[in-house]
């Protein structure tokens, strides 16, 4: 086909698309006959949709849903169809950029100038080594990502934890899934869901809690909608939210509740079961498979515990002071009365250092703790729409409880950020399991509490790989000596290499930058300066402190703009990779095209940086803090055949085992691999020479080494080649068979192995020995085994630390919209998505707006005690807040809403609550 025919056929196809007509098959055939289609994975949310991508002339030219993909069955959401266009924005980063002065020297106050990869790594090396020498292993920090490929995350964690002996690496998944992780670990003793997406087609009831699935998980919502339409009378949908949204459109019931009162609603449902419908309780299931537990309530809110910190403005201090104590109001006093307190009391946060401590209690104590959560009390504290009558709200709560309680009704509870981004996010995750366990509706086809993931590999990379600051792969943790020993053996490094002290979580890395305790930070595959609450502090920390900030990215987002060095990163289909989705499904893809410009993969950047460090520079005796010094392991390294002049690259990534994975592997035939073979761009690498590849199949090596961590104990993954032949597999994968429902002996090999004569086995090993106590505290020193059992937690209702007041009368909630992904770094570069939603709006109640003489489309200030931004008001659109609440998405850097939000977190998970702070709205 010549150029004229190509243009003609393309024009016909475009015209037909605009007119809504089908395209003649002959035109499609002519247009596509030179395209190469291959399977891949969507770049966006945690749903894990399979897609087909087409390549022609070195570019991705088309994307469509993969009909063979079991997750999405050929459908894409609006973002998914633009997976190709995110790669070709006009301001794509194509070369390293360094801040320099007029002489070309690095200058933190200088302007960005193009530099070579060699110059970029020279500067990185210099500033890293300076920070490492001055501050030790805690003087550096890595902002990691739930958008890393699995291999990238594994390489990063291995370099930091085994190479640098630091645990200061933490992913942006800390912002989205950490509370879910704690909920899983504390309840089941192991991470990730027991169920799978198949539950949607098998259930009778879908209840969403703080999960606007219609916009945030639209493909799953299409499956929910299909299930609803299959049996309109039987299948029920309830949407619980702090504001009305698109998920309510097909819901049978919408329940609008006040922020944080989901805690009270769960306890109301549990009370209904225990007090009013004891026959609904699955006593056999509970007695065989569960124990009752509780923990401390006086744990703070994850803020700094010094309200007089010199970086705080005067307006911030009152809120921060609540980290140490609060004055109980009438409503909170009722929920905490079991602790012997009353309204007006000062409630001191005495257990800030032990937020995750918990112990076994009796069923009688559990029942006693639920007693205050009557329908009258919960309706009073939780009703979120002041225009709704209390009787109507009570009726909805009763209907909700009845749906859960109905004996033969299958129920799935879905949640996302409304639960997880919560100062008691771990608690509310535990409460969901509480109700499902009481009813015996967990780990069964069509029934279960199910945490939906936000990012494409928050499960596969952040959680399973262990890029969190306290974790190692396969649910292991750095504080456990047995886990360190296992990891050191797999990594082939000396004993005592791994630092036993957990590193700084994401927000603490920011605070340590502000305090001058971290001098070097490297950002990969995320945008922390846009996505972290109370952002004015962190902008100042990046620009005004003596530190060096490196950002690897594909576009110049806010984080890149505050950086000292920017590295251009390859995007998803410009590299080999794998993601793990919310239902434990792992999916791999091949590199389809070469990266643009001089961009290189994050794996390449990690390995090239590793070449800059000799063992003698990082494996000597190292002081961590006043209580911990890491011993020198150089002699042990020599005994293992290493030389002190070997680099971390030689030992960790280019060892004998790695080089056994041949570059000319048959699985790679016909596909580029820029990391392994170099490519036609002839990139001048970090050593100033042309990079012609590592010469071994590094991605396959990283995968096969990583999967060793999970084999044999319930985290089994298939081999590399298998994933390239299938549309993903749900782990554990045992004898080639995936697992749909964990802990159920009919479906889970490990459950059957743990308890061959039982229906269920909750075989997770974490925190499975507990003392016994009452509602106040543990009463025994001795710990008792909970082998194969899960925990039913009692957790009290507590309010958010900052609530509306006379000066700041509105709740602020943040989140996403359908058309954009996270901070908009990619999707705002897609013309069609930008035209659809060009700016973040301030959604507010129409009556509130009219009362303030604010019209549709007016520009207002959204202001908190921390900062303010301008936004355009909308009260006619997709989101309908009740009076007293506004909703502002965070994808738009021109509406920098995280300057306004509060950096309070769940103390157990360290996950930020982006959903609740107090603001005032004024005309701009």
Curated annotation (Swiss-Prot):
Amino acids binding substrate: 890
Specify where it is mainly localized: periplasm
Q: Which GO terms describe its cellular component?
A: membrane; nitrate reductase complex; periplasmic space
Entry protein name: Periplasmic nitrate reductase
Please name the GO terms of the biological process aspect recorded for this protein, alphabetically.
Mo-molybdopterin cofactor biosynthetic process; nitrate assimilation
Start and end residues of each 4Fe-4S Mo/W bis-MGD-type domain = 35-91
Protein family according to the UniProt entry: Belongs to the prokaryotic molybdopterin-containing oxidoreductase family. NasA/NapA/NarB subfamily.
GO MF annotation terms: 4 iron, 4 sulfur cluster binding; electron transfer activity; iron ion binding; molybdenum ion binding; molybdopterin cofactor binding; nitrate reductase (cytochrome) activity
> Which cofactors, by name?
[4Fe-4S] cluster; Mo-bis(molybdopterin guanine dinucleotide)
Q: What is its EC number?
A: 1.9.6.1
Q: Name one Pfam family in it.
A: Molybdopterin
SUPFAM superfamilies in the record: ADC-like, Formate dehydrogenase/DMSO reductase, domains 1-3
- Name of encoding gene: napA
Compartment list: Periplasm
Modification note: Predicted to be exported by the Tat system. The position of the signal peptide cleavage has not been experimentally proven.
Quaternary data:
Component of the periplasmic nitrate reductase NapAB complex composed of NapA and NapB.
What does the entry comment about cofactor binding?
Binds 1 [4Fe-4S] cluster.
Provide the residue positions that the database annotates as binding [4Fe-4S] cluster: 42, 45, 49, 77
Q: Which UniProt keywords apply?
A: 4Fe-4S, Electron transport, Iron, Iron-sulfur, Metal-binding, Molybdenum, Nitrate assimilation, Oxidoreductase, Periplasm, Signal, Transport
Instruction: Name the species this protein comes from.
Output: Campylobacter lari (strain RM2100 / D67 / ATCC BAA-1060)
| Top-rank lineage group of the source organism | Bacteria
> Where along this sequence does the record place binding of Mo-bis(molybdopterin guanine dinucleotide)?
79, 147, 172, 176, 209-216, 417, 421, 527, 552-553, 575, 602, 814-823, 898, 915
Q: What class of enzyme is it?
A: oxidoreductase
Query: What catalytic activity does the UniProt entry give for this protein?
Result: 2 Fe(II)-[cytochrome] + nitrate + 2 H(+) = 2 Fe(III)-[cytochrome] + nitrite + H2O
As given in the record, the signal peptide range reads 1-29
Kindly give the InterPro entries that the UniProt entry links to this protein.
Asp_de-COase-like_dom_sf, CT_Nitrate-R-NapA-like, MoPterin_dinucl-bd_dom, Mopterin_OxRdtase, Mopterin_OxRdtase_4Fe-4S_dom, MopterinOxRdtase_cofactor_BS, Periplasm_NO3_reductase_lsu, Prok_molybdopt-oxidoreductase
This chain's function reads: Catalytic subunit of the periplasmic nitrate reductase complex NapAB. Receives electrons from NapB and catalyzes the reduction of nitrate to nitrite.
């Amino acid at each position: 086909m010549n150029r004229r025919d190509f243009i003609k056929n393309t024009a016909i196809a475009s015209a037909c698309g605009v007119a809504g007509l089908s395209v003649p098959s002959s035109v499609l055939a002519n247009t596509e006959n030179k395209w190469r289609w291959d399977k891949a994975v969507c770049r966006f949310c945690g749903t894990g949709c399979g897609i087909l991508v087409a390549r022609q002339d070195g570019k991705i030219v088309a994307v469509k849903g993969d009909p063979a993909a079991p997750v999405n069955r050929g459908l894409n959401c609006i973002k998914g169809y633009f997976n190709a266009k995110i790669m070709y924005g006009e301001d794509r980063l194509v070369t390293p950029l360094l801040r320099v002065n007029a002489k070309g020297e690095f200058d933190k106050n200088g302007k960005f100038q193009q530099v070579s990869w060699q110059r970029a790594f020279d500067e990185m090396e210099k500033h890293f080594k300076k920070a490492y020498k001055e501050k030790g292993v805690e003087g550096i920090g890595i902002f990691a990502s739930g958008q890393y490929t699995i291999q990238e995350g594994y390489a990063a964690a291995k370099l930091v934890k085994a190479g640098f002996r630091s645990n200061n690496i933490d992913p942006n998944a800390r912002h989205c899934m950490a509370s879910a992780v704690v909920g899983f670990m504390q309840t089941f003793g192991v991470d990730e869901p027991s169920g799978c997406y198949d539950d949607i087609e098998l259930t009778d009831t879908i209840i969403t809690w703080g999960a606007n699935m219609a916009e945030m998980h639209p493909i799953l919502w299409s499956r929910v909608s299909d299930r609803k339409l299959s049996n309109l009378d039987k299948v029920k949908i309830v949407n619980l939210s702090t504001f009305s949204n698109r998920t309510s459109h097909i819901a049978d019931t919408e329940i609008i509740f006040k922020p944080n009162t989901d805690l009270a609603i769960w306890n109301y449902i549990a009370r209904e079961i225990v007090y009013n419908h004891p026959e609904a309780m699955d006593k056999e299931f509970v007695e065989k498979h569960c124990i009752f537990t509780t923990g401390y309530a006086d744990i703070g809110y994850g803020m700094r515990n010094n309200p007089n910190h010199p970086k705080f403005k005067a307006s911030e201090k009152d809120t921060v002071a609540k980290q140490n104590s609060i004055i109980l109001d009438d409503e909170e006093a009722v929920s905490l009365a079991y602790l012997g307190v009353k309204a007006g009391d000062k409630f001191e946060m005495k257990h800030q250092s032990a937020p995750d401590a918990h112990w076994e209690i009796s069923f009688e104590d559990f029942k006693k703790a639920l007693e205050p959560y009557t329908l009258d009390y919960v309706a009073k504290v939780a009703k979120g729409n002041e225009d709704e009558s209390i009787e109507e709200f009570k009726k909805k709560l009763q209907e909700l409880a009845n749906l859960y309680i109905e004996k033969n009704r299958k129920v799935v509870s879905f949640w996302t950020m409304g639960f997880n981004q919560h100062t008691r996010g771990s608690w509310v995750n535990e409460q969901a399991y509480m109700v499902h366990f009481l009813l015996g509706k967990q780990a069964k086809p069509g029934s279960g509490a199910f945490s939906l993931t936000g990012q494409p590999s928050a499960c596969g990379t952040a959680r399973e790989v262990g890029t969190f600051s306290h974790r190692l792969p396969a649910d292991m943790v750095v504080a456990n000596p047995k886990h360190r020993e296992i990891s050191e053996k797999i990594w082939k490094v000396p004993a005592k290499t791994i630092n036993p002290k957990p590193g700084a979580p994401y927000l603490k890395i920011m605070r340590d930058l502000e305090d001058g305790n971290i001098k070097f930070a490297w950002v990969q595959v995320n945008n922390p300066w846009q996505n972290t609450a109370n952002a004015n502090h962190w902008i100042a920390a990046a620009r005004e402190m003596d530190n060096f900030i490196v950002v690897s990215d594909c576009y110049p987002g806010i984080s890149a703009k505050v950086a000292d060095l920017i590295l251009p990163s390859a995007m998803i289909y410009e590299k080999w990779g794998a993601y793990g989705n919310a239902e434990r499904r792992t999916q791999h893809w091949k590199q389809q095209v070469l990266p643009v410009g001089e961009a290189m993969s994050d794996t390449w950047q990690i390995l090239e940086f590793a070449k800059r460090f000799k063992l003698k520079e990082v494996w000597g005796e190292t002081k961590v803090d006043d209580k911990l010094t890491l011993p020198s392991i150089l002699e042990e390294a020599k005994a293992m055949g290493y030389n002190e002049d070997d680099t971390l690259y030689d030992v960790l990534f280019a060892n004998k085992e790695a080089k056994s994975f041949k570059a000319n592997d048959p699985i790679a035939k016909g596909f580029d691999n820029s990391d392994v073979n170099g490519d036609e761009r002839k990139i001048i690498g970090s050593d100033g020479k042309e990079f012609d590849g590592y010469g071994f199949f590094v991605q396959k090596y990283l995968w096969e080494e990583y999967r060793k961590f999970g084999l044999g104990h319930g985290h089994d993954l298939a081999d590399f080649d298998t994933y390239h032949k299938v549309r993903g597999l749900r782990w554990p994968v045992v004898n080639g068979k995936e697992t749909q429902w964990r802990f159920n002996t009919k479906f889970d090999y490990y459950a059957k192995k743990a308890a061959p004569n039982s229906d269920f086995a909750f075989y997770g090993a974490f925190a499975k020995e507990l003392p016994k106590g009452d509602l106040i505290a543990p009463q025994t020193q001795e710990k008792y085994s909970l082998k194969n059992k899960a925990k039913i937690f009692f957790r009290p209702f507590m309010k958010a630390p900052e609530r509306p007041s006379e000066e700041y009368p509105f709740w602020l909630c943040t989140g996403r919209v359908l058309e954009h992904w996270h901070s908009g770094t990619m999707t705002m570069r897609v013309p069609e998505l930008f035209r659809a939603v060009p700016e973040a709006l301030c959604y507010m109640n129409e009556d509130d707006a009219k009362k303030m003489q604010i019209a549709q489309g007016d520009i207002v200030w959204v202001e908190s005690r921390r900062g303010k931004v301008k936004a355009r008001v909308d009260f006619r659109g997709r989101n309908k807040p009740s009076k007293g609440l506004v909703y502002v998405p965070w994808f738009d850097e021109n509406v920098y809403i995280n300057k306004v939000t509060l950096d309070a977190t769940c103390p157990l998970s360290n996950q930020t609550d982006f959903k609740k702070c107090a603001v005032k709205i004024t005309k701009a």
